[in-house]
Amino acid sequence: MEESLSMRRVVVTGIGLVTPLGCGVDVTWQRLIKHESGIRKIDAFDVSDLSSKIAGMIPVGEEPGAFNPDDWLEPKEQREVDDFILYGIAAASQAVEDSGWQPKVEEDKDRTGVLIGSGIGGLQSIYNTSIIMHEKGARRVSPFFIPASLINLVSGHVAIRYNFTGPNHSVVTACSTGAHAIGDAARMIERADADVMVAGGTEAAVCRIGMAGFAAARALSTHFNDTPERASRPWDRDRDGFVIGEGAGVLVLEEYQHAKKRGAKIYAEFSGYGMSGDAHHVTAPAPNGSGAYRAMRNALSSAKMEPSDIDYINAHGTSTPLGDEIEHDAVKRLFGSAANKVSMSSTKSSIGHLLGAAGSTEAIFTILAIQNGIVPPTLNLENPSEGCDMDLVPHEAKAVSYTHLRAHETEADLECRLLLEKKK
């Protein structure tokens, strides 16, 4: 039995995106490889007393490529959920439609699960409801407040929408959330707990309290408020903090034979997953990058690969003064001489840091790099920090022919690494 379980392969058959570059996979990808930026000045709420006044914000409207909430939920339903749930539903709906998976019989529905997480959840709803309660009293609190804010209800809403009655789960691991969701969902398929899993991350923390909290921790960029598109600059010596972003990335994962039998389109194969914790600090990574090193090593071991097998790394690369160099050095330490042939870029330079949605969004970017033979660039990398001498794909996307690619996500004490490859 153990041998048969270990041989279950996991592939990606559907993808969906809602990002600061637009709503939908195609529009987001095209803008990404054309080195466009989704980071702009915040105009949705008052930022006059905030030190950071910029964010990666989803374009909302009816024009092509914009996010229109009415496309995904009725107005009444929109009022019953926080935006992070709305974004998650939108990305999941895209992914499910893209996969073509529409189970009709109970057995197939029971073998289809959902695992979507968020780093923070309904922060805007919590903030708004706190104000209402303070100003108008407890009786004015909406009965939808709690279900609108709970992180697990992204998975719940998606399951209800499609009547998926398999494993229903959620992940809350800060910036590693989206990557953990994919890895954990893949393991459910590998272990035969499910045949299909809808997995990913979503986040909507661009609000006054979210901005104020990260600013108080001195985590955000503050030197580029007048030129927001220049603010996220991973590995550049002038970086001064990350740019918060919002959005969702969701994938449909499927057991290989199951996908093959129904003639599904296969984007990539999930080949490895590694986790670690550096047991160091709640917000700062260990100076020697030990957590990232172990997570990468574990992912390679899981995939039965060597560092020399890896062609491209989509890095965590948040644009923080401390984290970027630590991650870079951890990669070089593990890869040794193989680091000279690896390309590594950070797509946060285009969309900001999507927190709980970062890992899944960047996993999708990695898959699209495999599919299209194009590595997305690191924007604003004008003067690399001393020692940052890997190929960091500055400014322009690069045409490649790669087979094994890696998506990274890190959050201080938490580390998660995914390995993706072309389906053989």
What are these regions (language model features)?
Residues 403-410, 422-424:
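Conserved small/polar residues in nucleotide/adenosyl-binding loops
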Residues 88-101, 151-154, 159-203, 242-264, ...:
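Active-site-proximal alpha-helical scaffold in enzymes
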Residues 9-13, 40, 227-303, 311-312, ...:
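Condensing-enzyme catalytic core mediating Claisen C-C bond formation in acyl metabolism
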Residues 47-60, 125, 205-232, 274-294, ...:
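Active-site-adjacent elements of ketosynthase-type condensing enzymes
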Residues 135-142, 180-183, 187, 196, ...:
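Glycine-/small-residue-rich "gating" segment that lines the acyl/pantetheine channel
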Residues 14, 32, 92, 114, ...:
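Conserved small-residue
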Residues 12, 36-173, 202-213, 307-323:
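Conserved beta-ketoacyl condensing-enzyme motif
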Residues 1-77, 257-269, 364-378, 417:
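ACP-dependent fatty acid/polyketide chain-elongation machinery
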